[in-house]
């Protein structure tokens, strides 16, 4: 991983400290093109997952189809094979629609407006196991309820024998005898 571990107990400080610890360039990166666009990138163990909103979307079929045409993804991983993978990830990461009790005023009003206009709306699906609504998702969940990679899969693979190197920059991966 490019950054250092950012354990939940270190996520209790102010926003500035959270941004310095969790975000590459203190969340001030931009991608330049026709427009300058903020480009947020995590730098802690777990990448961006410790400091994002834990929003989980399933890959739309139209995106898969485009990647299948452009990059040959369809031959390697057909779209219908993804359903079981998505279901397993949802189960392992506690992905479910955000409960109404956690919406807050803005989201509740948005839902009321959508209903009044006859629009269909759905709560965002998030990987959180019992959100406490601290509103610190982008600084890192101090309660360790967000199912980020540093809280879920990384400890699991370490327990199974993987080694984690933090604060390292990977320039290439050498594979030999089935190991990287």
Regions found by a protein language model. Give the residues of each.
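Residue-level marker for well-ordered alpha-helical positions
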Residues: 37, 108, 151-152
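N-terminal glycine-rich phosphate/pyrophosphate-binding loop and immediately adjacent elements
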Residues: 1-67, 79-80
